[in-house]
Curated annotation (Swiss-Prot):
Organism whose genome encodes this protein: Buchnera aphidicola subsp. Acyrthosiphon pisum (strain Tuc7)
Pfam families (alphabetical): Ribosomal_L29
One GO MF term: structural constituent of ribosome
Entry keywords, A to Z: Ribonucleoprotein, Ribosomal protein
Entry superkingdom: Bacteria
Lineage: Bacteria, Pseudomonadati, Pseudomonadota, Gammaproteobacteria, Enterobacterales
SUPFAM superfamilies tied to this protein: Ribosomal protein L29 (L29p)
Family as reported in the entry's similarity comment: Belongs to the universal ribosomal protein uL29 family.
GO BP term, example: translation
Classification via InterPro entries: Ribosomal_uL29, Ribosomal_uL29_CS, Ribosomal_uL29_sf
Record's GO cellular component terms: ribonucleoprotein complex; ribosome
Protein known as: Large ribosomal subunit protein uL29
Gene: rpmC
Length: 65
């Protein structure tokens, strides 16, 4: 919930950079998961939810304009 509040304060450009960072992080976590080195599997779910939240906010900001 804290992340969503922080995402709402950002502008469109910052949301895109945040989305790219989250996608990279998701990729890295997936690679760690496949190789068996992932110590905290809950992070996959957390990152996936954050990606969905950022995408939803980007869509809503585009509808407003």
């Amino acid at each position: 919930m804290k992340a969503l509040v922080g995402f709402r304060k950002k502008n469109k450009k910052d949301l895109y950079t945040e989305l790219l960072q989250l996608l990279r992080e998701q990729f890295n976590l997936r690679m760690q998961s496949v190789s068996g080195k992932l110590k905290q599997p809950h992070l996959l779910r957390k990152v996936r939810r954050n990606i969905a939240q950022v995408k939803t906010l980007l869509d809503s900001k585009e509808e407003i304009k």
